[in-house]
Amino acid sequence: MSWFNYFRATRGNSARTAKERLQIVIAHERIDRSGPSYLPRLRGDIIEVIRKYIEIDEDQVKIQMEQEGDMDVLALNIQLPDASPPLSETRHSSKQ
């Protein structure tokens, strides 16, 4: 009987350990999918800077984090409008 109890206790312990490890893996995958917590603020700051120079719609800016090897890469895709005078030039000409 003592042999059965010995193996049973180990099995229960390993199942618990496996469950904890799986929960850790799932938590890491969720974090990776959602991206860093600062990404929305970074997106807003980037849009603000771009708007100093050209008029864009927020929907035209796509930002995502990618992993290439051991490096995190910030991928930025901006749909620019057709060539038009910069905002500063249009503002100056409208004042005259």
Swiss-Prot record:
Record-linked Pfam families: MinE
Keyword list, A-Z: Cell cycle, Cell division
Keyword flag Heme: no
Membrane-spanning intervals of the chain: none
Single GO BP term: regulation of division septum assembly
InterPro entries, per the entry: MinE, MinE_sf
Functional description taken from the UniProt entry: Prevents the cell division inhibition by proteins MinC and MinD at internal division sites while permitting inhibition at polar sites. This ensures cell division at the proper site by restricting the formation of a division septum at the midpoint of the long axis of the cell.
UniProt xrefs under HAMAP family: MinE (MF_00262)
Family: Belongs to the MinE family.
The protein's name: Cell division topological specificity factor
Primary gene name: minE
